[in-house]
Amino acid sequence: VQGIHDALPLLGMNQLCKYKDNIDYTTANLIYDGINYYVCLTCFIDKDDTVYKRKNPIIGIDLGIKDTVTCSDGTKFNISIGESEKLKKLQRTLEGQIKGSNNWNKTKKKIRKEYIHITNKKNDVANKLVHNLLSIADIIVMQDEQIESWRQTTNSADKIQHSILGRIKSRLSYSDRVVILDKYFPTTKYCSNCGNMLSLELNDRIYECPVCKRKEDRDIHAANNMIYFYQQIKDRPGTDQTLKLV
C-alpha cells in the first residue's frame, strides 16, 4: 500500500489455509470500499469429485412478499433485513449536527459503514439460501417475477426494500440447473387438476377451485404449477432456459 511501509494484519486467511497445497493463485487486487481495505484473490482449486445426492429431482419456487420463498414441497423461507437500530440512532444524531462539521462528517462515515454492513448481511443470507435451494434439487423452476414493478402495484415498498428477492432471483439465474418461466404463465390462476382458471386477490392466501374443489396454499399451488408448465413444454423444439408461453 502506497505510503505504508510496515506490515498490515490480514484477516480471513483461514479461508485459504484449508486448501493447503491444492490451490493456484492468479491475480490479487486491493479494494477500498470507502471504509475498509480488502484483498480480492482469484485462484484455482482442484475440482471436488463428490457426487451430491439431492432430495428432489425437481422443485418449483415462488417468490413473494409475504413469504420470501415458497417451495413446491411446502418449505417456506421468510427473510427480512431492515435498518438496524444502530443506523436509526446514527441518522437521528446526524439530524442534530451542523452540516459539513467534523462531527457531521464522522457520523456520515459511520452511517456509510453501517449501510455496507447491512448490504453484506443481505448478500451473505442470499448466497446461503441459494446454495441451500440448489443443494436440495436437481432442477429448480421459477417464474420471471417483475419484482421492481411490485413497488408500484402494491403497498409493500418497505417489505420489498428489506427483502432479498432481487438477490435470490439474480443468483439463481446464473445456474444452468434453474429454469425460468415467462411471467405470463398463469401459475396462480390455473388449476392443473381440471384446467379451470380462477382469479385471486392479493389478500387471498388459499387457492380453492370451484370446479374440482382442489384446495391448497396459494404460493405452494403456484410453485407446483411451475413444475406442471415446465413438464408440459420442456420437450418442445427450441425450448431454452427461459420458457415462454406460446
Show the residue positions of the predicted features.
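Acidic carboxylate diad motif detector
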Residues: V1-I31, H162
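Positively charged, helix-rich recognition surfaces that bind polyanionic ligands
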Residues: G34-V246
